[in-house]
Regions:
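Solvent-exposed alpha-helices and their adjacent loops that cap or buttress functional pockets
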Residues: 1-2, 24-25, 89, 97, ...
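A contiguous loop/helix-start segment that scaffolds small-molecule binding in enzyme catalytic cores
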Residues: 5, 163-202
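Structural signal for conserved beta-strand scaffold positions within catalytic alpha/beta enzyme cores
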Residues: 34, 61-64, 125, 145, ...
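Short, charged, surface-exposed secondary-structure boundary motifs
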Residues: 42-44, 71, 134-136, 180-181
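Class I SAM-dependent methyltransferase SAM-binding "motif I" and its flanking Rossmann-like core
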Residues: 104-165
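Short, surface-exposed amphipathic charged segments that create phosphate/polyanion-binding patches used
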Residues: 73-81, 138-141, 164-168
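Class I S-adenosyl-L-methionine
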Residues: 1-15, 20-22, 27-121
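Short beta->alpha linker loops
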Residues: 43, 100, 127-130, 156, ...
Length: 202
């Protein structure tokens, strides 16, 4: 019997935001796949452990994805991870890959998900609460009303090129460019204020 792979979003950090579907999949799994080399350093694992303490007894397999833009290095890492996943699935194992937020938003899980599907094997996802939705809920604001647009902008973008976007802009993975982002938004805020326009920044 062939196994299956499930990418499980564990939310932004609050263990109370872990979904019932995620908890069930984790409890029913044979093996937990982590996007970190060590479970002690994996934020997603720490979140789950607070709700599903029995995860400590599960077989854990770290998936090592190097933080690099070198295509050859990334491809080699993906090949190794897929080979490990395929071996376990051929043994009939039910695998759960933990990922922060939602597996469909900037998640390393998809490197494996696509390979598994291409090989004709079973892969699916369980949604998690994305960080930007959690922030909006915490602030009590709407991300979009009526026909407003939402733009999700990763740190790889040139910040200056996004100031003309209409609607809501969500900047993600901007740690290395945070100072630059703040400076650009301050300049834009002042410019819009002079023109009698508003720019809400959270």
């Amino acid at each position: 019997m062939e196994g299956r792979l499930i990418g499980v979003g564990v939310g932004p950090g609050d263990p109370e935001l872990l979904t019932l579907a995620a908890v069930r999949a984790i409890r029913e799994s044979d093996c937990i796949l982590l996007p970190n080399e060590k479970k002690e350093e994996c934020y997603a694992y720490k979140i789950v452990r607070q709700v599903v303490p029995e995860i400590e007894e599960k077989d854990v397999c770290p998936m090592q994805f190097p933080m690099t833009k070198d295509a050859d290095v990334l491809r080699a890492a993906q090949d190794r991870c897929f080979a490990e996943v395929r071996t376990r699935m051929m043994q009939g194992k039910k695998l759960v890959f933990l990922t922060i937020g939602d597996p469909s938003v900037y998640s390393t899980y998809h490197y494996i998900h696509r390979r598994v599907l291409a090989a004709g094997m079973s892969a699916s996802m369980i949604s998690g609460v994305p960080s930007f939705c959690a922030v909006a809920a915490r602030l009590g604001i709407s991300l979009a009303d009526q026909g407003e647009e939402i733009h999700i902008i990763p740190g790889s973008y040139t910040v200056e090129d996004t100031t003309d976007y209409t609607g809501t802009r969500i900047y993600m993975k901007s740690g290395k460019k945070l100072k630059q982002l703040i400076d650009v938004l301050r300049t834009e805020f002042a410019s819009r204020e002079q023109q009698g326009e508003t720019l809400e920044i959270y």
